[in-house]
Amino acid sequence: MSLMNGVFIDYFVIFFGLVFYALLVVVYLLRAHQLEELEWKLSPVFSLQLIPFVLLWVVNLLIGNDSGRLVVGLPIIIYLIYDFWYRLITRKKPYHHPDRWPIGLVIYLLLLFIGSIGLNWYGYLVSRSYGTMLVVSFFIMMSSFGYYQYRYNKSKKAK
């Protein structure tokens, strides 16, 4: 395979990284406005992200791309597998505000952050500007999470 194929793979990983963060923004905005039914309907779309990330990781492996891309690409795949298992296979609705966090939620959040760090680092392996773009997208996603938490706490105080 040529170097050009590796470049296209990198661009696709960056693109799907941006899609990943955009979908998380949508999920947190839906939660903020208490549209859980719509969020639940979106969960298969979120889980479908597993397909391009796995395919791109396998292609990176097959063309012999450097091990750095393989290592930093793996955490997002692990997170998406866990998310797929939790949402679609167990058919459990997420429990967003427990008094005591169950171990599954702790694992979920750790995998989300580790996957995001890996995804952002992949961007930096490609170029500084792509890495920065993914980090900015991560903070936009975290801002939408903060908005969701703000709305939740505000509604809780109103009760």
Task: Enumerate the predicted regions with their spans.
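Hydrophobic core segments of alpha-helical transmembrane domains in multi-pass membrane proteins
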Residues: 15-20, 69-81, 128-140
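Transmembrane alpha-helical segments that form the membrane-embedded catalytic/substrate-channel core
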Residues: 22-26, 80-88, 138-152
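Membrane-interface helix-boundary motifs at transmembrane edges
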Residues: 29-43, 62-67, 91-99, 122-127, ...
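Membrane-helix boundary elements
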Residues: 43-71
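Hydrophobic alpha-helical membrane segments
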Residues: 74-87, 98-122, 136-141
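Terminal transmembrane helical module of multi-pass membrane proteins
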Residues: 113-159
